Amino acid sequence: MIFASSNRHKYEEFRRMLSDLIDLKFLEVDYLEPQGEDTREIVVTSAKWLSNYIREPFFIEDSGLFIEALNGFPGPYSSYVFKKIGNEGVLKLMNGVENRRAFFISVIALSYGRGIEVFEGRVQGTIAREVRGGGWGFDPIFIPNGSNKTYGELGDEKDRFSHRGASCRKLREFLMRFGSDRLP
């Protein structure tokens, strides 16, 4: 099966979480993602477009960080915002803000012969007051509920807590039920 993305970090996470089930191949593809407020709609539209070019089963994923005090910003624009202002910029926007509640959402679209299946993962948490740990993207500033560590401090343990881990578990259940080797 193929994971199509321009983000190798995402591929590494999915490969790690699915390695016992499928042989996941990385197709590095940079495509124009439609803009909008609905992450699910963005992913489905992108998968439909990519299915014109990729002729075997594949999946893509999009995610976003939604910060309550910022009215859901950066939301579906998370990748762009990270590239422009990074973690430090988000923390600057949150300077002096007491409400640190946020959530991460991950939406996977699996495209195969019978259509498109969508799997969503969502994790509630808070925004840290400083960058903590490594990782990539907003990992060093997001603390999932039930932990006192940021994603960046969790390392591979992040897979158990993360929004991407949650959506991947749903994809995994589908592949086990349907049979990943029988996808048309």
UniProtKB/Swiss-Prot annotation:
<dbReference type="GO" id="GO:0009117">
    <property type="term" value="P:nucleotide metabolic process"/>
</dbReference>
<comment type="function">
    <text>Pyrophosphatase that catalyzes the hydrolysis of nucleoside triphosphates to their monophosphate derivatives, with a high preference for the non-canonical purine nucleotides XTP (xanthosine triphosphate), dITP (deoxyinosine triphosphate) and ITP. Seems to function as a house-cleaning enzyme that removes non-canonical purine nucleotides from the nucleotide pool, thus preventing their incorporation into DNA/RNA and avoiding chromosomal lesions.</text>
</comment>
<dbReference type="GO" id="GO:0009143">
    <property type="term" value="P:nucleoside triphosphate catabolic process"/>
</dbReference>
<comment type="subunit">
    <text>Homodimer.</text>
</comment>
<keyword id="KW-0547">Nucleotide-binding</keyword>
<dbReference type="GO" id="GO:0036222">
    <property type="term" value="F:XTP diphosphatase activity"/>
</dbReference>
<keyword id="KW-0479">Metal-binding</keyword>
<dbReference type="InterPro" id="IPR029001">
    <property type="entry name" value="ITPase-like_fam"/>
</dbReference>
<protein>
    <recommendedName>
        <fullName>dITP/XTP pyrophosphatase</fullName>
        <ecNumber>3.6.1.66</ecNumber>
    </recommendedName>
</protein>
<feature type="active site" description="Proton acceptor">
    <location>
        <position position="62"/>
    </location>
</feature>
<dbReference type="GO" id="GO:0047429">
    <property type="term" value="F:nucleoside triphosphate diphosphatase activity"/>
</dbReference>
<dbReference type="GO" id="GO:0046872">
    <property type="term" value="F:metal ion binding"/>
</dbReference>
<keyword id="KW-0378">Hydrolase</keyword>
<keyword id="KW-0546">Nucleotide metabolism</keyword>
<dbReference type="Pfam" id="PF01725">
    <property type="entry name" value="Ham1p_like"/>
</dbReference>
<feature type="binding site">
    <location>
        <begin position="5"/>
        <end position="10"/>
    </location>
    <ligand>
        <name>substrate</name>
    </ligand>
</feature>
<feature type="binding site">
    <location>
        <position position="62"/>
    </location>
    <ligand>
        <name>Mg(2+)</name>
    </ligand>
</feature>
<dbReference type="GO" id="GO:0005737">
    <property type="term" value="C:cytoplasm"/>
</dbReference>
<dbReference type="GO" id="GO:0017111">
    <property type="term" value="F:ribonucleoside triphosphate phosphatase activity"/>
</dbReference>
<feature type="binding site">
    <location>
        <begin position="136"/>
        <end position="139"/>
    </location>
    <ligand>
        <name>substrate</name>
    </ligand>
</feature>
<keyword id="KW-0460">Magnesium</keyword>
<feature type="binding site">
    <location>
        <position position="63"/>
    </location>
    <ligand>
        <name>substrate</name>
    </ligand>
</feature>
<dbReference type="GO" id="GO:0009146">
    <property type="term" value="P:purine nucleoside triphosphate catabolic process"/>
</dbReference>
<dbReference type="GO" id="GO:0035870">
    <property type="term" value="F:dITP diphosphatase activity"/>
</dbReference>
<feature type="binding site">
    <location>
        <begin position="163"/>
        <end position="164"/>
    </location>
    <ligand>
        <name>substrate</name>
    </ligand>
</feature>
<feature type="binding site">
    <location>
        <position position="158"/>
    </location>
    <ligand>
        <name>substrate</name>
    </ligand>
</feature>
<comment type="similarity">
    <text>Belongs to the HAM1 NTPase family.</text>
</comment>
<dbReference type="InterPro" id="IPR002637">
    <property type="entry name" value="RdgB/HAM1"/>
</dbReference>
<feature type="binding site">
    <location>
        <position position="33"/>
    </location>
    <ligand>
        <name>Mg(2+)</name>
    </ligand>
</feature>
<dbReference type="GO" id="GO:0036220">
    <property type="term" value="F:ITP diphosphatase activity"/>
</dbReference>
<dbReference type="GO" id="GO:0000166">
    <property type="term" value="F:nucleotide binding"/>
</dbReference>
<dbReference type="InterPro" id="IPR020922">
    <property type="entry name" value="dITP/XTP_pyrophosphatase"/>
</dbReference>
